[in-house]
Amino acid sequence: MNIDKFTAHAKSVIASSQLLAAKNDHQQILPLHLLSSLLSEETGIIQTLINNTGGNINLLKDQVQLELNKIPKVQVEGGGQVYSSAEALKVLEKASSIAKDNGDSFVTIERIFEALTYDNTIAGKILTNNGINNKKIATAILQFRKGKKADTESAENSYDALKKYGRDVTELAESGKLDPIIGRDEEIRRTVQVLSRRMKNNPVLIGEPGVGKTAIIEGLAQRIFSKDVPESLINCRIIELDMGALIAGAKYRGEFEERLKAVLSEIKESSGEIILFIDELHLLVGTGKTDGAMDASNLLKPMLARGELHCIGATTLDEYRKYIEKDAALARRFQPVYVSEPTVEDTISILRGIKEKYELHHAVRISDSAIVAAATLSNRYITDRYLPDKAIDLIDEACSRMKIELSSKPEELDELDRRIIQIKIELAALKKENDEHSKKKIEHLTTALEKLESQSYDMGAKWQAEKSKLQQTQKLKEELDRSRNELERAERDANLAKASELKYGIIPEIMKKLQEAESMDNKGLLKEIVSESDIASIISRITGIPIDTMLSSERERLLVMEQKLRESVIGQDKAIKGVSDAVRRSRAGIQDINRPLGSFLFLGPTGVGKTELTKALAGFLFDDRNAILRIDMSEYMEKHAISRLIGAPPGYIGYDQGGVLTEAVRRRPYQVILFDEVEKAHPDIFNIMLQILDEGRLTDSQGITVDFKNTIIVLTSNLGAEILVNQKEDEDTYKVKDEVMEYVKAVFKPEFLNRLDEIILFHRLNRNNIHDIVKIQLESLKKILLAQNIILEFDESALNYLAEKGYDPSFGARPLKRLIQREIQNNLAKMILAGEISSGKTVKINSKDKELKVTMS
């Protein structure tokens, strides 16, 4: 007997029988040990053979274990060596003989099992007593192998390969596990046309990720199941190839190719009744490729060309170009079927079609307004993904969120229960006190507790009743779904009696009960309908763009936005109004959706509040003054520095890192972007800003389109500042606008200026403005000191002194900050370090004899 002529699985069975004998302290390997190992093998081949011969594997296992327990145990010091008995060797010799007689090059596990039926020991008797004999097993092996010979060391892997390495999509359609497919008739028709060709009948579905390529295959499977296809495809089955399972565990060279060949030969033998579906078709190119080995695509090519293999592929445009088109021999064997992204209207139809499946899964109801919102809002705000995938994700997540809310305690009831616990803790503490005040407090809290417990009990009972009603509705929906599947099956099997009973009796009755349950007033604690606002809320969480329903407090806040901004920015009312109007337009949803929310060029001398207004705007929108993307344009004075904004071109360092501007906006699409000191940048930088301002988009160095439609763009500049500085104090700034614009037009091209929403002039600050700014600066200092528990007080004389001394029409408010540092903060720092000012003290600032006094009280 040559052990090398046994397959890897057969060797594994012999080795495990040896381990079993050693574990049980048996002196030698008996046929019983071989039978026990065969009954426990992992491939499932032996179990299938036993089932096909009418045996029961669990009964066999129990009987074998009983007999193993009867074998005498002999313990040898040091473990000893376990040898094969003459009977076991005879079984293996018989297996080799049977394999040879049947034309097998290798001995497989089923041949060892067949040899055991010839055994005269207890193992053979157990099989005979269970009705398993050599004739039955030989017939079962013949049927199971379907004429295949064991000619490789891993022959067992090639049995029933399609079942191991594939998924029957037609079977899923039959059992009703696939979502209904709406539309896509043209793509399905084109796929059927290609499949019906004589040669090269292999379509490949090409489209962006998430447009529904796999759904088209599921739609075709449903049509095959319902016989809504040409005669040539009526008896076909679609099997999806699992490339992961095919590759997994292929340790030895040639094992992967052997598995794939087994799959292909099964398809070939089916005489065109099996259509192979390969999702992510590009994985074929290079899969299994090692030194001197062929990759999967080369194994497929001959069969594809001859029309022996019906194959449908699916891949994305990028991957098709990158992998398939490079292999011209493979590309010509496939016929491309392009799958475009559906329109918003088509997406709404698709969502309406699959709505019932999601309602059933999540046990909630989806309103039609939620479906329309999911399609329209995802199309507008989620720009880096494709319909219908992104819209379906929104519906799914909104339903999931509502399902979690339904299964948890309502907020009102939760608050009541927390209040009850709080009162009980207070009562427990007060009962330890004996004073009159505590007794009164106990009496008061006891009354409140009784009232709250009564409310909690009533609300809890109401919640449980509502929950029970929802569960009842869910059961009815599940029953209706089951009945519809049964009706389809009955109609297909021509079981007219059952079909009529379901169609005219059971289904109408369930629908009536369901309508009654859903029509009952449900204005209680639980909300079970997914609405438009739920979808908007999910998008807001994903993108950070506030499109969910505005609270009344936010509406009021937006109407008084100018007042809020004036608290930080003094004396620039026209600029504040222009920015406020842009924000209100965007939050009201009436701005041009293809442009940024607002684009402004702020012109004015230094220190008048251009950058400060941008920070105040960020503070108003995001409650964080630093939530702005600030790009200092003085860093982009050289032409080559421009590429930093959108990313370095291919071949340059940093190509894979993305651009400063594009990456920041991709990660946070709703923000204020400040291009500071814009006139200092290289003129070419404005060319890339043209499409941002006009179309609200920009393509980075890697070809990714970044959406700027939810940004506010602010550009600041000092152009024409000398004109504004030399202007009379009370003169209207807009009288000199034409002169300032001459400077602006000399630097910026007309096509750039024409794309801005507004060019806003900041006038120079007058003495009254400086007085107000002093107050803001001192209030800011007051907050800083308050954090150290030091109180700061100042009077009007201090304000007047600082305003007079810090006023400089050429430099705006910036000298004022330096003055406060010099006159106040420096003195305070010395006093704190010297220990003169400590926590809890009050510091007073006033002016006397044209000097600023800092005193402590």
Curated annotation (Swiss-Prot):
UniProt xrefs under InterPro entries: AAA+_ATPase, ATPase_AAA_core, Chaperonin_ClpB, Clp_ATPase_C, Clp_N_dom_sf, Clp_R_dom, ClpA/B, ClpA/B_CS1
SMART domains for the chain: AAA, ClpB_D2-small
UniProt-annotated binding residues for ATP 1: G207, E208, P209, G210, V211, G212, K213, T214
A GO cellular component entry from the record: cytoplasm
Repeat 2: annotated segments: 84-147
Coiled coil: 392-523
Transmembrane annotation, as ranges: none
Swiss-Prot/TrEMBL keywords: ATP-binding, Chaperone, Coiled coil, Cytoplasm, Nucleotide-binding, Repeat, Stress response
Annotated stretches, region: NBD2: 554-764
NCBIfam families the UniProt entry points to: chaperone_ClpB (TIGR03346)
Protein family: Belongs to the ClpA/ClpB family.
Subunit structure: Homohexamer. The oligomerization is ATP-dependent.
Stated name of the protein: Chaperone protein ClpB
